[in-house]
UniProtKB/Swiss-Prot annotation:
Cofactor(s) the protein needs: [4Fe-4S] cluster
Keyword vocabulary terms for this entry: 4Fe-4S, Chloroplast, Iron, Iron-sulfur, Isoprene biosynthesis, Metal-binding, Oxidoreductase, Plastid, Transit peptide
UniProt similarity note: Belongs to the IspG family.
Cofactor binding mode and count: Binds 1 [4Fe-4S] cluster per subunit.
Main localization of the protein described in the UniProt heading: plastid
UniProt-listed Enzyme Commission number(s): 1.17.7.1
Transit peptide feature range: 1-39
Name under which the protein is recorded: 4-hydroxy-3-methylbut-2-en-1-yl diphosphate synthase (ferredoxin), chloroplastic
Major enzyme class: oxidoreductase
UniProt: [4Fe-4S] cluster binding residues: C648, C651, C682, E689
Lineage: Eukaryota, Viridiplantae, Streptophyta, Embryophyta, Tracheophyta
NCBIfam families: ispG_gcpE
Length: 744
């Protein structure tokens, strides 16, 4: 980190001669030791900005302080309620003739992929998007020629009776923004590159005067656009991207959510200084965990500042297909469950009109949750970390003396996948083993990298069904857990099975009818009374908990009930692993299943709450449910079982056919778990936006590709025809390549 002066104090902290004070009533937590993450100088003494070990929020310490004295740090409010989904109150921002804010529906939008200079093609694309039901359409405007074309685009659409508001996407071009503000309804600016130079990822040092001069430069460059938007009644989005922060911001705050927030606040303060309030914020990242943290931190700051500006939600470079939908659902859905978000965009490497349907499904999910106003009884939340990730430590199964089978593999340390298996599947054991993604050797199953960890069998085969029982024995022998209801285990006992019990059965003592030492899995909803939850304290053989609320049930908010359950477990020192179990209704739409799982389970896993997932849907393919489960864990940055792709959705800047190239690269590299590859259409969303990708394939010029290792370019100007092979060779050169598995 650079040494200098903090550009602005944390808004919830007031420094006094006698120590530290807080400007509002807050909930406090004690911190005994605080590792500094940023050192800044001031005329009032030394200030350390650090991370609270219990809350994840920023805290401050002033010298002198007695050695070892605890700090009091605030737990910041970041949403209206932690007990239910209650939409955050935001002001109305007018985008053309469409109002945006909490008094209005969640707006949906996308972005064109055509060359903006091609007026006819862009108009056609906007019309297709509008016909699908989008509220806004964003168009890239990178230069004067594109800005001039925008006037013709707008006029042509109006002549065709398409009055959908148009948004100009601006990078590096303040003069272009001024021009297009005369015809488009909204201007998106990226604080990381609107006035600052392109990031070189350099460590910079600033004095107080240096930093102030940088802020004055930003104000000088940005103010004319603010005045132009006021003059023409335009809206604005101050849209920070995790991967395109300026060197100045990164030198102070790192490549972090805090840096994203501060970057946006610098621009917002200029807007407010000029009495311009028709703007929204966004905090996008390709990593859903980072994205969620940044939005929450921004809202916490707005609560402290008394601001009520709306939020545009999005996970940038989400990718394509179910992967892209899942990643978007985790990030956007988590925030919608918190009541945050006024407009959303699902960024997919697909035709832009294809983004509208998943976007609408997500918006409906958030609206439905807020309209129901269901939750749980108020409880005191002390342990969940809102602003940074630290996974709760669930105790994996330990081997007990005298046990004949190894239970240590029934759950995976990085996140577990459980699947529901039917009796019919036991009739074809080898097919079942393959469905569970087990590796077969002479017909015998063995666990592999992405093998299901445990299965739920609601009905056991008859004791005399030797073939079915042998199939189950072979699964138990490879440390795959077999969960079955207590009633089944009592009437048709399966050796070494894990009995599934509910709270009533625990209360009645029915589980004591099982042989001593039988392992248990307990199903809970999360809204049980504390007296019922106390039953967990007296049972020694609990291997895991299943948090299970039927999907679509309107009596309990799943996310909030789970948070209450985890708070109880942490408060009472109970470290049972918790599996998130969702049973979807029949005929559920696939996109609804992916989005529902991503939003409801992702909202917990991004906070480190949970140890695995069990998805059930009677009429969905077994392999689809299995793959969706693994995608969910990987999207939450837990268990990595396949290649991770950071793939931009394409826009008018894109220098090659992203969908075609992305498909080619995936076909040849999808078998590399632990490897992350960025596929970026241009340099604007290139090195910075690649975030933590290991390798990058980036459009550098028409027909030419640049290859990156991390954020460093290592090869330039490779012809498109050989670029994919060059990427593979680069992966090999860095020792990350393995040959694809041979089909049996």
């Amino acid at each position: 980190m650079a040494t200098g002066v903090a550009p602005a104090p944390l808004p919830h902290v007031r420094v006094r001669d006698g120590g530290i004070g807080f400007t509002r009533s807050v909930d406090f937590a004690k911190i005994l030791s605080v590792p500094a993450t940023l050192r800044v100088g001031s005329s009032r003494g030394r200030v350390l900005v650090a991370k609270s070990s219990s809350t994840g929020s920023d805290t401050m310490e002033l010298e002198p302080s007695s050695e070892g004295s605890p700090l009091l740090v605030p737990r910041q409010k970041y949403c209206e309620s932690i007990y239910e989904t209650r939409r955050r109150k935001t002001r109305t921002v007018m985008v053309g003739n469409v109002p945006l804010g909490s008094d209005h529906p969640i707006r949906i939008q996308t972005m064109t992929t055509s060359d903006t200079k091609d007026v006819a093609k862009t108009v056609e694309e906007v019309m297709r998007i509008a016909d699908k039901g989008a509220d806004f359409v964003r168009i890239t405007v990178q230069g004067r020629k594109e800005a001039d074309a925008c006037f013709e685009i707008k006029n042509t659409l109006v002549q065709k009776n398409y009055n959908i508001p148009l948004v100009a996407d601006i990078h590096f071009a303040p003069t272009v923004a001024l021009r297009v503000a005369e015809c488009f309804d909204k201007i998106r600016v990226n604080p990381g590159n609107f006035a600052d130079r392109r990031a070189q990822f350099e460590q910079l040092e600033y004095t107080e005067d240096d930093y102030q001069k940088e802020l004055e430069h930003i104000e000088k460059v940005f103010s004319p656009l603010v005045e132009k938007c006021k003059q023409y009644g335009r809206a604005m989005r101050i849209g920070t991207n995790h991967g395109s922060l300026s060197d100045r911001i990164m030198s102070y705050y790192g490549d972090s959510p805090r840096g994203m927030v501060e970057s946006a606040l610098e621009f917002a303060r200029i807007c407010r200084k000029l009495d311009f309030h028709n703007f929204v914020f966004s905090m996008k990242a390709s990593n859903p965990v980072i994205m969620v943290q940044a939005y929450r931190l921004l809202v916490a700051e707005m609560y402290n500042l008394g601001w009520d500006y709306p939020l545009h939600l999005g996970v940038t470079e989400a990718g394509e297909g179910e992967d892209g939908r899942m990643k978007s659902a985790i990030g956007i859905g988590t925030l919608l469950m918190d009541g945050l978000g006024d407009t959303i965009r699902v960024s997919l490497t697909e035709p832009p009109e294809e983004e509208i349907d998943p976007c609408r499904r997500l918006a409906n999910l958030g609206t439905h949750a807020a309209d129901l106003q269901i939750g749980v009884a108020p409880f005191e939340e002390k342990h969940r970390r809102y602003f940074d990730f630290q996974r709760r430590s669930g105790q994996l199964p330990l081997q007990k003396e005298g046990e004949e089978v190894d239970y240590r593999g029934v759950l995976h340390r990085d996140g577990s996948v459980l699947m529901s298996v039917s009796l019919d599947q036991l009739k074809a054991p080898e097919l079942l083993y393959r469905s569970l993604a087990a590796k077969l050797v002479v017909g015998m199953p063995f666990k592999d990298l992405a093998t299901v960890d445990s299965i739920l069998l609601r009905e056991l085969p008859p004791v005399e069904d030797a073939q079915a029982r042998l199939a189950l024995k072979r699964l138990v022998d490879i440390s795959m857990g077999v969960l079955t209801p207590l009633s089944e285990q009592l009437t048709k006992p399966l050796p070494h099975a894990i009995a599934l019990v509910n709270v009533d059965e625990l209360s009645s003592g029915a589980h004591k009818l099982l042989p001593e030492g039988t392992r248990l899995a307990v199903t809970l909803r999360g809204d049980e009374s504390y007296e019922q939850l106390d039953l967990l304290k007296g049972v020694d053989d609990i291997t895991m908990l299943l948090h299970s609320v039927p999907y679509g049930e309107e009596k309990t908010g799943r996310v909030h009930a789970a948070r209450r359950l985890f708070e109880y477990l942490e408060t009472n020192g109970l470290n049972f692993p918790v599996i998130h179990h969702i049973e979807f209704p029949k005929s559920v739409n696939r996109d609804d299943l992916v989005i529902g799982a991503g939003a409801n389970v992702g909202a917990l896993l991004v906070d480190g709450l949970g140890d695995g997932v069990l998805l059930e849907a009677a009429d969905q393919e077994f392999e689809f449910l299995r793959d969706t489960s693994f995608n969910l864990l990987q999207g939450c940055r837990m268990r990595n079982t396949k290649t991770e792709y950071v793939s931009c959705p394409s826009c008018g800047r894109t220098l090659f056919d992203l969908q075609e190239v992305s498909a080619q690269i995936r076909e040849k590299t999808s078998h590399l778990p632990g490897v992350s590859i960025a596929i970026m259409g241009c340099i604007v969303n290139g090195p910075g936006e690649m975030a933590d990708a290991d390798f990058g394939y980036v459009g550098g010029a028409p027909g030419k590709i640049d290859l990156y290792v991390g954020k460093t370019v290592v090869q330039r100007g490779i012809a498109m025809e050989g670029a994919t092979d060059a990427l593979i060779q680069l992966i090999k050169d860095h020792g990350r390549w393995v040959d694809p598995p041979v089909e049996e």
